[in-house]
Swiss-Prot record:
Gene name tied to this protein: mshA
Pfam families, per the entry: Glyco_trans_4_4, Glycos_transf_1
Family: Belongs to the glycosyltransferase group 1 family. MshA subfamily.
Biological role stated in the UniProt entry: Catalyzes the transfer of a N-acetyl-glucosamine moiety to 1D-myo-inositol 3-phosphate to produce 1D-myo-inositol 2-acetamido-2-deoxy-glucopyranoside 3-phosphate in the mycothiol biosynthesis pathway.
Protein name: D-inositol 3-phosphate glycosyltransferase
Protein keywords: Glycosyltransferase, Magnesium, Metal-binding, Transferase
Keyword Metal-binding listed: yes
Binding-site list for 1D-myo-inositol 3-phosphate: H25, D36, A37, G38, G39, M40, N41, K94, Y127, T151, R171
Keyword Transport: no
Top-level EC class: transferase
C-alpha cells in the first residue's frame, strides 16, 4: 500500500495526542533553586504548557515526597502531574533513588493499566533515572522513548570542581543503557549532541538538537530603579548577581573570590559593591549549608554579600533587572537557563565558556564568556561591567535580542516534531513535512 504525504501527516497528527513525561527524582512543582530542583524543572513545566497549547496533552510522573500531595494535580489545561508512591514520603538523596526504581516503575505501569490500551503515544524521560523507567515502560507499552539527559556523568567527571565528587559508575552505566535503547535523544545544544555521540556512542541519526527556551512574558526588561527599590538595593550600587543551586558544579565561590579581588584592587568599591546570591544548597552542597557565608567571611567581604533564598519567577525577574551583570561561573552547563532569563530581562551575563553557555550567551554581544575559573580573570571581567557603563548598556541591548530567539513555543514545536519522527520511525511510516 502506498501512503500519500497527506495521509502520513494525518497519521502523525492523530497519533501525537498524549505524552507520558517521566521526572522521577524531582517534581516540576518544586521551587527551582532548592534541593534537586533547577533548570530541568523549569524546562519540563514550560515545555509541557506549550505542548498542551499545540494540542498535545502531557502527564508528568514524579515520585511522591509527601502524604499531603494529591494523586493527580492539574497545573495547566492539558498538563497534569501524577505523584507516584515509591519509597518513603520524603525527599531522598539521588544516590538512594535507584533503590526506588522498581516501586516507581510499578506505579507508572499501574496508572497506564487503568485506561484503555494506547493511552500514551510517546514517553519523554528526563535524567538517567527516569530513562531507566522509560526504557521498561517503552517495552511494555510498545511506544517510542524520547530521552533528555540534562546532565551527563561522563561530562561532569571530565570537568569536576575541586571540591566535587565524581559521578558513580552506576550512573555512567545507566546512562549508557538509556542511550542505546532510546528512540530519540534530545540534546540542548550541538555541543551536547556531539558529547552524546563521542562519549556514549549514540547513533547520530537518533540525536536531535532542541534548544530550551525562556518565558518571555515573565522575563522581560523593566525599570532597574524600580526593581532595586522593591528589593531594598541602593540605587547607585554595583550589583553582581548569582542565581542557582549552591553546589561545587555551579561554582558560586568564584564570584565571591573575584569580588574580594576587586576590592583589593580598588578599595573604594566597597561602599557601593553588592554581591547577591539567590539560591539554596543542593547535591554535594547539602553537606555544607553555610558554605557561601563561610567563604564570604573568610575573604572578609561579608559586608557586601547578600544571601537570598530561592525566589519564584516574578521575583527572580526583579533580581535580574536590578543587577548590573549576572555571573554564571559553572564548571559545566548543558544549557544555562539562568543566563537566558537574565538576558531576557536586559541584564548581560558573564559566563564560563563551557557547555551550553556557549550557545546561550553571544560572546561580546549579549555578555562575556570567560575561560577558566581563576578569580583574578573573573575580577578583571567584572570590573569592566562596573567601570564601563556604556559598554555594559550595549551588551544589555544585545542580551534582549539574544533571548528573544529562545521562546518556549519554539521549543515545544521542535519537541512535537521529534515525537512525531520517533513514532513514524517506530511504525515504519515515512516522514513528510506538511506545507
Amino acid at each position: 500500500m502506498v501512503i500519500s504525504p497527506s495521509e502520513v501527516v494525518s497519521v502523525r497528527r492523530r497519533r501525537v495526542s498524549r505524552v507520558a513525561t517521566i521526572s522521577m527524582h524531582t517534581s516540576p512543582l518544586d521551587q527551582p533553586g532548592t534541593g534537586d530542583a533547577g533548570g530541568m524543572n523549569v524546562y519540563i513545566v514550560e515545555a509541557a504548557r506549550r505542548l498542551a497549547q499545540l494540542g498535545v496533552e502531557v502527564e508528568i510522573f514524579t515520585r511522591q515526597t509527601s502524604r499531603d500531595l494529591p494523586p493527580v494535580a492539574e497545573i495547566a489545561p492539558g498538563v497534569s502531574v501524577r505523584h507516584v508512591t515509591a519509597g518513603p514520603y520524603e525527599e531522598l538523596d539521588k544516590g538512594d533513588l535507584p533503590g526506588q526504581l522498581c516501586g516507581f516503575l510499578s506505579g507508572v505501569l499501574r496508572t497506564e493499566a487503568m485506561y484503555e490500551p494506547g493511552r500514551y503515544d510517546v514517553i519523554h524521560s528526563h535524567y538517567w533515572l527516569s530513562g531507566q523507567v522509560g526504557w521498561l515502560a517503552k517495552e511494555r507499552w510498545g511506544v517510542p522513548l524520547v530521552h533528555t539527559m540534562h546532565t551527563m556523568a561522563k561530562v561532569k567527571n571530565l570537568l569536576l570542581a575541586e571540591d566535587d565528587r565524581p559521578e558513580p559508575t552506576a550512573r555512567v552505566l545507566g546512562e549508557e543503557q538509556v542511550v542505546q535503547v532510546a528512540d530519540r535523544l534530545v540534546a540542548n545544544t550541538p555541543t551536547e549532541a556531539q558529547e552524546l555521540i563521542d562519549l556514549y556512542g549514540a547513533a547520530p541519526g537518533r540525536v536531535e538538537v532542541v534548544n530550551p527556551g525562556v518565558n518571555l512574558n515573565v522575563f522581560q526588561p523593566a525599570s532597574k530603579g524600580a526593581a532595586r527599590h522593591r528589593l531594598d538595593l541602593p540605587q547607585d550600587a554595583h550589583v553582581l548577581l548569582f542565581v542557582g543551586r549552591v553546589q561545587p558544579l555551579k561554582a558560586p565561590d568564584v564570584l565571591l573570590r573575584a569580588a574580594a579581588r576587586m576590592l583589593i584592587d580598588d578599595p573604594s568599591l566597597r561602599s557601593r559593591l553588592v554581591v547577591v546570591c539567590v539560591g539554596g544548597p543542593s547535591g554535594n552542597g547539602l553537606a555544607r549549608p553555610s558554605y557561601l557565608t563561610d567563604v564570604a567571611a573568610s575573604l572578609g567581604i561579608s559586608d557586601v554579600v547578600r544571601i537570598v533564598p530561592p525566589a519564584p519567577q516574578h521575583e527572580l525577574a526583579d533580581w535580574y533587572r536590578a543587577a548590573d551583570v549576572t555571573v554564571v561561573p559553572s564548571h559545566n552547563e548543558s544549557f544555562g537557563l539562568v543566563a537566558l532569563e537574565s538576558q531576557a530581562c536586559g541584564t548581560p551575563v558573564a559566563a564560563a565558556s563551557v557547555g551550553g553557555l556557549r550557545t546561550a550567551v553571544a560572546d561580546g554581544v549579549s555578555g562575556v564568556l570567560v575561560e577558566g575559573h581563576d578569580p583574578q580573570d573573573w575580577a578583571r571581567v567584572l570590573s569592566r561591567f562596573v567601570h564601563r557603563p556604556a559598554w555594559r548598556d550595549a551588551l544589555a541591548a544585545g542580551a534582549v535580542a539574544q533571548a528573544a530567539a529562545f521562546g518556549w513555543s519554539a521549543t515545544a514545536a521542535r519537541l512535537a516534531d521529534v515525537y512525531a519522527g520517533a513514532m513514524a520511525n517506530l511504525h515504519h511510516v515515512p516522514i513528510a513535512v506538511s506545507s
